[in-house]
Amino acid sequence: MQLLNLSLFFLLPFATANPIPQDSQNIIPGQYIVTLKDGLTTAEIDAHKTWLAFTHRSNIAAKGHSGIESEGVFKHFQIHKLNMYAAGLDKKTVEELRRSPHVKSVLPDQKIYLAEAVTQSNAGWNLGYMSSKGQPSPSWSTLTNYTYDSTAGEGVWAYVLDTGVNVNHVEFEGRAILGRNSIPNRPHEDTFGHGTYVGGIIAGKTYGVAKKATVVSAKAFDGGSSSYRYILDSYEWIVKNITDSDRKSKSVINLSISGAKYQPFDEAIENAFQAGITTVVASGNDGRDASQNTPASSPNAITVGALRWENTRPGFSNYGKVVDLFAPGELIRSGWTGGNNATRVASGTSAASPHVAGLVAYLMSIETLSSPSEVTARVLNLTIPGLVKDARGSPNKVAYNGIQEML
């Protein structure tokens, strides 16, 4: 899907924060994400909030605006050293914000999409592939033996920012819990299926890579698309929950989502990384260079492309230098909505990313990995090189759990 294409830009002190041309069909009218400059003191941030509230009220009163533009700040976000907020604003207030000495950028909020799965017929090769060094088999149906350490992610928390998770699904055996619901006036349940599917690949008893990990649901979607207003709310909550619970080295975030490049969210992921938190993301399903996508282009996320059983890249999978590795992403069965035993077979980088998030959880449970840099290095060190046909400039690396070297 083609969304907005934003470029990274930097602002000098007191310079005007000029808007970047965007794809208007994906902009959410009247709604903005404002990023404050680094290094502001608490007093400066408070002064900015006071100034904004007064300026916005004055402009709304003068012009008689109503609707989303009159709502002002919805939510402030703080992720490590990053300060930002989502707001409904009129154009005059936006112009004044862009001249503020405290503001780094003011960007229209935009839609972001699930890296959505496509339903296919029967399947089941993916877990066997993860423990087989990626060697192709005469038939995908013969890749049925998944070998793994029995610790299997125990004591690790996998956060799924998605459509919610059916925590009562039999795949989770009571190991899934509800965390944050960022969608107003909607229940924290998965009526769409995508989040349950993703969580099942990470930690399901049958379909999961890390079969004893705990899944934490953060609902930021109520269908196939959402906005950064809700994405940032869930992501901020996850980072705070991990930090407050003192489990940075035992937690992983999965983002099976994709949109056009959007610098504020890339910065949020980078700040989580600097805070010591690992994020795994889908490369996206546009069949293009993943450097055009967020969160795929986030420099310190682990970006995952999709792979078929015979070591070919499906045409839908994004590619390029920002992709770190490939994992199974076609004909993958996992849990679904429609009942506590429901399953679905599907394809997409939405399936590839949770294989690696599950691998991260698995490795965290059996090894001492104290930082996201160590996690990334270990995952990439275990990969099998040179197997992917048509890698299209991506690092030619395939995810592997290292079990044969551990036996």
UniProtKB/Swiss-Prot annotation:
Keywords on record: Glycoprotein, Hydrolase, Protease, Secreted, Serine protease, Signal, Virulence, Zymogen
Annotated ranges, domain Peptidase S8: 124-407
Pfam families: Inhibitor_I9 (PF05922), Peptidase_S8 (PF00082)
Class of this enzyme: hydrolase
Coiled coil region boundaries: none
InterPro entries linked to this entry: PCSK9_ProteinaseK-like (IPR034193), Peptidase_S8/S53_dom (IPR000209), Peptidase_S8/S53_dom_sf (IPR036852), Peptidase_S8_Asp-AS (IPR023827), Peptidase_S8_His-AS (IPR022398), Peptidase_S8_Ser-AS (IPR023828), Peptidase_S8_subtilisin-like (IPR050131), Peptidase_S8_subtilisin-rel (IPR015500)
Cellular compartments annotated: Secreted
GO MF, any single term: serine-type endopeptidase activity
GO annotation, biological process: proteolysis
Residue intervals of the Inhibitor I9 domain: 31-114
Catalytic residues of the enzyme: D162, H194, S350
Propeptide cleavage-removed residue intervals: 18-115
First and last residue of the signal peptide: 1-17
Known glycosylation sites: N145, N241, N254, N341, N381
UniProt GO cellular component terms: extracellular region
Entry EC number(s): 3.4.21.-
Predominant subcellular localization, coarse grouping: secreted
Task of the protein: Secreted subtilisin-like serine protease with keratinolytic activity that contributes to pathogenicity.
Family: Belongs to the peptidase S8 family.
Name of the featured protein: Subtilisin-like protease CPC735_013710
Species in which this protein is naturally found: Coccidioides posadasii (strain C735) (Valley fever fungus)
